[in-house]
């Protein structure tokens, strides 16, 4: 079997005939099948192969069944690795990127992926950047982008800012370097404006997205309802506080307000700047050090200092000490919180560490802290009430007395999108001394190519002829913005661009007719690691573009498949572990179809896949057996006709196995609850081939192969096209319906029991009468009934026969 040449033959045929381009007929039923676009690193890995094999199987199935399928591919081509390659190898990022794209395209073709070439692009293409920059300006003018100075997550290795979502366990999501804090100006997208909608619309994705992803997004958005109120600064402390009148706090546990024994404020809180003069030199040094630590570092060890000032409890009028605490976050609520050590684990630990008094306000006999809902005590007029009842009454009291109000808070923060690097989409803004920040009018703003990348700072800052520009408003000298956009902006709308053919998107980001027809994406495939990065950003960007009038949908992805990682020797494949399997080498040895079949058979998409050379050999042998048995079939040039006349049991079994597999294929591809368990479908195909291998009747073989090749085409397309052309001619190879009559059993299996104890099984004709079944059952149980007296015979149709003996 010369699988290499067979695969090349069909790959050339597909590209030459543009077999995978969707039709421009908006009346056809459509499917938009999309795998997350890759970064062009130069070589695809097994994670790519798995992702794109799953997507390709879906696309080919729907195409075979007369859907108008959009199955595109592109490249997420801006980013740090290109700059790192420039430093390491002395090659321009653009050259490195586009050479890698070309290499990866060849690998995709070698795997037989049915991508639409007429939709392909790279996100670093100038005509893509042009419309992205226009979106940026539109969002700026609508007030959905702003610029401010803030303490930001900084990756010392990549020398760039990271969004909160890009810091994982205190480390850079890309290079795993420990992140530090740095104060810089930054552009922000107001994703918080959409927090409630992003949260609420998760309900529309239930049963279509993995529950784990929905939970991760829900927790990241982090909605909480509570009481916002103030502790007034004690009169004698006002001067030290530069006349700041009160400390505003937010709490979800208003019922614990009588247990407050300290107030904790973030080191970034404006009060600290003035009151820090009252602390010791050692504490002052510690507070300043906290400012330069990440949230993860702050969580490792609780630290704080008493500021020497007090605030007044709004109900008891007692003086409450004010502390700086590293666990108080400036970007959540007001940056201040009430410390209730009797009812909160964190507050309790901090109080014990610094010997702060603890006031018990619940009637629980358990050890402190009492974190569960309890009956209150020492809580004024709300004593003896449950926590939940007291909470509502206290909030109502605060609102009635104008002491505070009920508010909603979100953990979600605005998305910082400025990056201090060269290889990214330039932010299209001009800084003018006279006009302020002015949007550029000549788009796209492209990157200068005559740059030096040495790893020291942002190359655009050093490029005078590019950096110095003219203000579009007053035409005086000005400075161009040298930060580039976070690459997650590019991946937040690429799926919209795919809808439109290349020749119709030169002057528009996407065509409205194509957009309305193909969107939303029907099935989106990618790793779960993107749950609160790309997937959340893409949902937000879709809603923001909707509000700008660019589109008319709320959610971009109807259904989501998160495929598991590919492991070898129990660990994720990586060069450092020395357990990488090269797709290129495997393709040379086994061919694309064997690799695809193994990928789909080894595990369901959502599960981790353990690489297994023996299983790959097994996939290869299955394909060889498929070719071998095909030699027993006489090719036909017309569509074969199938008749079920006078078949023996083995022939009926073969037909049954084939049509069972066909029925299963429709369930696997069309029912989300099947979890796309291709492994079970392939197992059914293997059973069907085993049954066909036992046959010599050419009619049975012909029908079996006609059906089996249709089932297998999405998974092993080269083999299916080769054999269907050879045996039936492709023009005759149309989808066939499940023959339900072939699935009907002629026999049924009954359990045989004596006094309820199972003794044997009986296979009988489904048309056998009760009397016939009883006679056959007694004969089968003869040795058990030999010396027994049967008092009662019980027949439960289609299930069992039970004999009650004396």
Swiss-Prot record:
Keywords: Aminoacyl-tRNA synthetase, ATP-binding, Cytoplasm, Ligase, Nucleotide-binding, Protein biosynthesis. SUPFAM superfamilies: Anticodon-binding domain of a subclass of class I aminoacyl-tRNA synthetases (SSF47323), Nucleotidylyl transferase (SSF52374), ValRS/IleRS/LeuRS editing domain (SSF50677). It catalyses: tRNA(Leu) + L-leucine + ATP = L-leucyl-tRNA(Leu) + AMP + diphosphate. GO terms for molecular function: aminoacyl-tRNA deacylase activity; ATP binding; leucine-tRNA ligase activity. One of its GO terms (biological process) is leucyl-tRNA aminoacylation. It is found in: Cytoplasm. Its EC number is 6.1.1.4. InterPro entries: aa-tRNA-synth_I_CS (IPR001412), aa-tRNA-synth_Ia (IPR002300), Leu-tRNA-ligase (IPR002302), Leu_tRNA-synth_edit (IPR025709), Methionyl/Leucyl_tRNA_Synth (IPR015413), Rossmann-like_a/b/a_fold (IPR014729), tRNAsynth_Ia_anticodon-bd (IPR009080), Val/Leu/Ile-tRNA-synth_edit (IPR009008). Its main location: cytoplasm. Pfam families: tRNA-synt_1 (PF00133), tRNA-synt_1_2 (PF13603), tRNA-synt_1g (PF09334). ATP binds at residue 575. HAMAP family: Leu_tRNA_synth_B. This is Leucine--tRNA ligase. The gene is leuS.
């Amino acid at each position: 079997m010369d699988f290499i040449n067979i695969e090349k033959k069909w790959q050339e045929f597909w590209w030459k005939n543009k077999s995978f381009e969707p039709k421009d007929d908006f009346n056809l039923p459509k499917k938009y099948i999309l795998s997350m676009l890759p970064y062009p690193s130069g070589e695809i890995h097994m994670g790519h192969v798995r992702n794109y094999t799953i997507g390709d199987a879906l696309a080919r199935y729907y195409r075979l069944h007369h859907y108008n399928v959009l199955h595109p591919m592109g490249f997420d081509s801006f980013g740090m690795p290109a700059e790192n390659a420039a430093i390491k190898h002395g090659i321009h990022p653009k050259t490195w990127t586009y050479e890698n794209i070309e290499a990866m395209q060849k690998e995709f073709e070698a795997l037989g992926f049915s991508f639409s070439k007429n939709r392909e692009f790279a996100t670093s293409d100038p005509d893509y950047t042009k419309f992205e920059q226009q979106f940026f300006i539109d969002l700026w003018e609508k007030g959905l982008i702003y610029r401010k100075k803030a303490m930001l997550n900084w990756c010392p290795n990549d020398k760039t800012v990271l969004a909160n979502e890009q810091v994982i366990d205190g480390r850079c999501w890309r290079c795993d370097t420990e992140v530090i804090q740095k104060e810089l100006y930054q552009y922000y997208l107001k994703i918080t404006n959409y927090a409630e909608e992003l949260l609420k619309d998760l309900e529309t994705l239930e049963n279509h997205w993995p529950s784990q992803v929905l939970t991760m997004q829900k927790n990241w958005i982090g909605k909480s309802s509570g009481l916002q109120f103030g502790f007034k600064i004690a009169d004698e402390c006002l001067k030290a506080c530069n006349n700041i009148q009160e400390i505003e706090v937010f709490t979800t546990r208003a019922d614990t307000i009588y247990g407050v024994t300290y107030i904790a404020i973030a080191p970034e809180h404006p009060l600290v700047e003035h009151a820090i003069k009252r602390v010791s030199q050692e504490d002052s040094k510690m507070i300043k050090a906290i400012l330069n630590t990440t949230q993860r570092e702050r969580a490792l060890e609780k630290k704080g200092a008493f500021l020497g000032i007090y605030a007044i409890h709004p109900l008891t009028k007692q003086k409450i000490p004010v502390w700086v605490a590293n666990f108080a976050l400036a970007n959540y609520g007001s940056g201040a919180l009430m410390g209730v050590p009797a009812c909160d684990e964190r507050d309790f630990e901090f109080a014990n560490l610094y010997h702060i008094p603890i006031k018990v306000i619940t009637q629980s006999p358990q050890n402190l802290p009492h974190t569960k809902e309890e009956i209150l005590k020492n809580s004024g007029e709300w004593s003896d009430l449950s926590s939940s009842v007291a909470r509502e009454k206290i909030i109502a009291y605060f609102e009635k007395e104008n002491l505070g109000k009920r508010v909603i808070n979100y953990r979600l923060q605005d998305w910082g999108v400025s990056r201090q690097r060269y290889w990214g989409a330039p932010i299209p803004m001009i800084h003018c001394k006279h006009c302020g920040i002015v949007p550029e009018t000549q788009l796209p703003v492209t990157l200068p190519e005559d740059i030096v990348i040495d790893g020291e700072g942002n190359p655009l800052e050093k490029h005078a002829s590019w950096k110095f520009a003219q203000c579009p408003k007053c035409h005086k000298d000005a400075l161009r913005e040298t930060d580039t956009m976070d690459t997650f902006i590019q991946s937040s709308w690429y799926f919209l661009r795919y809808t439109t053919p290349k020749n119709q998107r030169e002057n528009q980001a996407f065509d409205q007719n194509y957009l309305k027809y193909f969107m939303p994406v029907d099935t989106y495939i990618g790793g779960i690691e993107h749950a609160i990065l790309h997937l959340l950003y893409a949902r937000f960007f879709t809603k923001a573009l909707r509000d700008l009038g660019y589109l008319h949908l709320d959610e971009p992805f109807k259904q989501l498949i998160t495929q598991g990682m590919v492991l070898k020797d129990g660990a994720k494949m990586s060069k450092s572990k020395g357990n990488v399997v090269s797709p290129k080498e495997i393709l040379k040895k086994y061919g694309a179809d064997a690799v695809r079949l193994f990928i789909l058979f080894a595990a369901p998409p959502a599960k981790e896949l353990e690489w297994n050379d023996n299983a790959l050999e097994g996939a290869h042998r299955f394909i060889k057996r498929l070719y071998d048995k095909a030699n027993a079939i006489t090719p036909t040039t017309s569509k074969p006709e199938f008749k079920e006349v006078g078949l023996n049991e083995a022939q009926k079994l073969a037909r049954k196995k084939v049509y069972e597999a066909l029925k299963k294929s429709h369930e696997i591809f069309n029912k989300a609850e099947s979890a796309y368990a291709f492994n079970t479908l392939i197992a059914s195909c293997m059973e069907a081939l085993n049954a066909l291998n036992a046959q010599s009747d050419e009619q049975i073989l012909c029908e079996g192969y006609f059906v089996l090749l249709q089932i297998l085409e999405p998974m092993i397309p080269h083999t299916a096209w080769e054999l269907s052309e050879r045996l039936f001619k492709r023009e005759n190879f149309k989808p066939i319906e499940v023959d339900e009559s072939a699935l009907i059993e002629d026999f049924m299996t009954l359990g045989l029991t004596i006094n309820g104890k199972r003794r044997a099984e009986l296979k009988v004709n489904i048309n056998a009468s009760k009397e016939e079944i009883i006679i056959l059952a007694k004969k089968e149980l003869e040795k058990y009934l030999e010396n027994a007296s049967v008092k009662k015979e019980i027949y439960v149709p289609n299930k069992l026969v039970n004999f009650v003996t004396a």
